[in-house]
């Protein structure tokens, strides 16, 4: 049975009930304008070339710090070992130089934290010459980070001509679930385009939108995309808010490396057509949750990211358009929410300081 509005199990972020606001979709092709993003100001004049193009879609939604609540998911994780800390990537780049700093930040948390960061080429946004990795392949309950591979699958399906962003899907009463997002407040009988659903799934972490997209693509198709992309620790095993599936032990999983891999491909524009990747980056730039990684980045630096939370998990994965751009994914479990968010902020700050040095 899929959970109802009265059971808020969090699949990240924004809840129903009193927290539901008027549902809206910023137009995907709206021109960039200066806007206040909860203590961070992004202005069109600050960007040129690729970054300006990346901001041209999806807009910049007002970011809010909001309380979240959730129910307990199943837990499954890999133990950290010295082998997971070491990587085969060259250790000569600016980002690899802070491996020890990040290890020191997370040392006291044992197996509760996974971090993966990779430098990007400032021109092509392809992965560059170094990484930071602390238990990057440990498997975590994915929460709403699972929406990244769902997005990737949708983009690939559109590229293949098997799906249109303009295709309409009508919400039925059976589709209404609680947790994150505002579509639930509009009720059944309302139709949305695939483009609108993808935007809501990422920017607002909307669970109804995610389930509708999964239903259109097929769960097996999403998992096939994960396999094709080399996401070895990622699996989609249930719909959002499906408490019955959780009780039966079915859970969605991912790793820090897998989450970063999807974002790196989106940054480089290689997961689908460049135009579709640009639109997807617009969804990520419109993310409404401004905690975690965003708090460790100074104003004026663009962050395209996706967060995820459950009762015992707090995750964030981002493309950070710093002077030296990079992708950063931080997955935590069994920490108090504020403790996890503070750690995400501190890791983000440490890496971003090097990105501008």
For the regions a protein language model found, what residue spans apply to each?
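Short, glycine/proline-biased beta-turn/loop segments that scaffold the active-site neighborhood
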Residues: 160-186
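N-terminal secretory signal peptides
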Residues: 1-38, 48-55
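Beta-lactamase-like hydrolase cores
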Residues: 77-139, 350
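Mid-domain, small-residue-enriched loop/turn segments at the edges of structured enzyme/sensor domains
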Residues: 112, 211-263, 267-268
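Conserved catalytic neighborhood of penicillin-recognizing serine enzymes
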Residues: 176-211, 219
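Short, Gly/Ser/Thr-enriched beta-strand-loop segments that form substrate-interacting elements
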Residues: 291-344, 352
